[in-house]
């Protein structure tokens, strides 16, 4: 019987360590679940991408160019994780949805970066989840889940165990859609999740938290889809 596919958008913070320890932990986690799942990972750009984008923006680069810089960094991060996984991983990051679809047919762990300018890696991950028929989409971020307000600005912010897709869409509509500015999710991702009814969680990018989510234990914030 074919393994179920799970798409994990992995925050760029996983790739910023100096000694590679965190990266190896993620590689061990992905290798460990690959007996029962086929993981497809989308690497974020993280701090390095934001720094490069800020530098290029100060030099007058347009938004499309800034997006392309972010995509380039995310694909380098993907290559780092591929190196850590070795023979368990597809040997290079797919550059298009069609390439992703062909890559998963090989049965290995597939690691991608960004694909298209104007689209966050969250949107990319949702499109990939749709394309490969993923049973689950885990959006692993720098926070524990979705809060009722910005936890970085409000110490009394409350994390939500569940949030309706419509409510999250309203929250995101207030955010800027500029290169390097996406955090929890983007509107493209929500549209894809809704139309294909993809089971989705937003949670912290932490190996132990991801293990809980894969086992079916409550972790982070569950995205509640509207009735069909």
Swiss-Prot record:
Protein's cellular compartments: Cytoplasm
Activity modulation: Inhibited by UTP.
The UniProt record lists the keyword Kinase: yes
Enzyme class name: transferase
Gene3D superfamilies referenced in this protein's UniProt entry, alphabetically: Acetylglutamate kinase-like
Gene Ontology molecular functions: ATP binding; UMP kinase activity
UniProt entry tagged with the keyword ATP-binding: yes
Binding site for UMP: 45, 67, 115-121
Pathway(s) served: Pyrimidine metabolism; CTP biosynthesis via de novo pathway; UDP from UMP (UMPK route): step 1/1
Keywords in alphabetical order: ATP-binding, Cytoplasm, Kinase, Nucleotide-binding, Pyrimidine biosynthesis, Transferase
EC number: 2.7.4.22
Entries under InterPro entries matching the protein: AceGlu_kinase-like_sf, Asp/Glu/Uridylate_kinase, Uridylate_kinase, Uridylate_kinase_arch/spir
Binding site for ATP: 9-13, 46, 50, 141, 147, 150
Catalytic activity: UMP + ATP = UDP + ADP
GO BP terms, alphabetized: 'de novo' CTP biosynthetic process; UDP biosynthetic process
Gene Ontology cellular-component annotations: cytoplasm
Main localization category: cytoplasm
Subunit structure: Homohexamer.
Known role: Catalyzes the reversible phosphorylation of UMP to UDP.
Family: Belongs to the UMP kinase family.
Name of this protein: Uridylate kinase
Species for this entry: Cenarchaeum symbiosum (strain A)
